[in-house]
Amino acid sequence: MSYKPIAPAPSSTPGSSTPGPGTPVPTAGSVPSPSGSVPGAAAPFRPLFNDFGPPSMGYVQAMKPPGSQGSQSTYTDLLSVIEEMGKEIRPTYAGSKSAMERLKRGIIHARALVRECLAETERNART
């Protein structure tokens, strides 16, 4: 079974047809690039996520002082990440690329939190 994306329905409204001779058509130079770069310039490849180490998720995680309730908040963070990931399952299955990317980032974040929880559990078991 192969995945086939659903094509958007053609937008044909009554009264609208192809542009006539008096309708201005934008040229390639007048349309801004979605990336904001110079047209024709190749953007360097940059991966969307990195699975080596904990993810940054757009913010810097603060270091917790020893003896704080870090494990409880890490576990709570993990539960909330899993809950958010659950909301992305159905849109991902329906073909949403943005939901798929959010789900990927959520999985990576959850894996990092699980590693933190396991490390905390091992530290507590040794003491």
UniProtKB/Swiss-Prot annotation:
Q: Choose one Gene Ontology CC annotation of this protein and give it.
A: microtubule
In which family does this protein belong, per the annotation?
Answer: Belongs to the CDK2AP family.
Taxonomic placement: Eukaryota, Metazoa, Chordata, Craniata, Vertebrata
Q: How does it assemble?
A: Component of the nucleosome remodeling and deacetylase (NuRD) repressor complex, composed of core proteins MTA1, MTA2, MTA3, RBBP4, RBBP7, HDAC1, HDAC2, MBD2, MBD3, and peripherally associated proteins CDK2AP1, CDK2AP2, GATAD2A, GATAD2B, CHD3, CHD4 and CHD5. The exact stoichiometry of the NuRD complex is unknown, and some subunits such as MBD2 and MBD3, GATAD2A and GATAD2B, and CHD3, CHD4 and CHD5 define mutually exclusive NuRD complexes. Interacts with CDK2AP1. Interacts with CDK2. Interacts with MAPK1.
Regarding how it is modified after translation, the entry says: Phosphorylated by MAPK1 and CDK2.
Tell me the protein's name. Cyclin-dependent kinase 2-associated protein 2
**Natural source organism:** Mus musculus (Mouse)
Gene label: Cdk2ap2
Subcellular location(s): the record lists: Cytoplasm; Nucleus
Keyword annotations for this protein, in alphabetical order, are: Cytoplasm, Nucleus, Phosphoprotein
On tissue specificity, the annotation reads: Oocytes (at protein level).
